[in-house]
Amino acid sequence: MPKKKSKKVKKNGKGVGGKADVHAHEEGKRNKSLLGHNAIFTPEVIDDIHIKSQLGRYRMRGMALMKKIPTFDDLVFLPGTLTRFVIEGYREKCETKTVIGPRCENPIELDIPVYITGMSFGALSYEAKTALARGATMAGSATCSGEGGMIPDERRYSEKWYYQCIQSRYGFNPHHAQLADGIEVFIGQGQKVGMGGHLMGQKVTDQVAEMRSLPSGIDQRSPARHPDWLGPDDLALKVEELRQLTKNKVPIQLKLGASKVYDDVRMAAKCDPDSIYLDGMEGSTGAGPHICLLYTSPSPRDATLSRMPSSA
């Protein structure tokens, strides 16, 4: 019987392992990629939709921003030449002292123009709050009580300390305000401008609840605006009320979440504060709607550079 011819497989032909097979494999990978991925409905977006459909509301989370934004690292310094007299860095000191509220009896003097913003005891912890107070004192800077009242040890370790007046009345103690080196009126924060505070129930311990005169173990919300003012005119009265409380001894600061910066700062200035604190979206928060944390308020850099009147 004649021998059967064996079928040869060409390595560079259409057989197994050939170029055509490799091409088909790559084409399949591309098709799979096109079918399995969408620039708008990414796997993360789809998961977010599923979670919100199960919750029946928007998602809440804390911590900082989870996307890249323009920062102050994108800016450069203009060195001195003829228009600004230069100093000899190895034998002359550079003065960084900043004075807040020079017209007050007891202005706040910072060795460096850096300030540890208000973060509540409920959002952080006793150890974190006291450590920040010690660090601010070592650096010649200041810290702030944050929402919800004063921790005695934080006040003791802080050489310069702000007491925060938030959008609600709970947690505010006029006797504690009189112990402060400055008063900060909280109007908004960068990561959730136009929204009130939200402390998750898991963080509302008995001690936190006692400080705020509220029940423990349940979510605590503060309103988006203070019940004592409905506009800039009422806010000016609140600033004057706090001046009378502190006998005009310490500076009053307004904290704004960055929005229409030019217009908001002009209206805030009419309330006659000693300083205006502008907070951008880079700052973190204890809890807030996930979508607001990502897509509201400009970055600190853009907020600082926003000097033109708004068109709206």
What is each model feature region?
Residues 2-114, 118, 123-137, 141-142, ...:
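Conserved, well-structured core domains of diverse proteins
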Residues 111, 118, 123-245, 249-269:
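Active-site-facing alpha/beta catalytic cores
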Residues 266-278, 282:
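Acidic, glycine-rich loop-and-beta core segments that form the ion-binding/anion-interacting portion
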Residues 288-294:
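C-terminal helical cap(s) of enzyme catalytic domains, especially alpha/beta-barrels
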Residues 295-300:
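Conserved small/polar residues in nucleotide/adenosyl-binding loops
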Residues 308-312:
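Hydrophobic alpha-helical segments, chiefly the membrane-spanning helices
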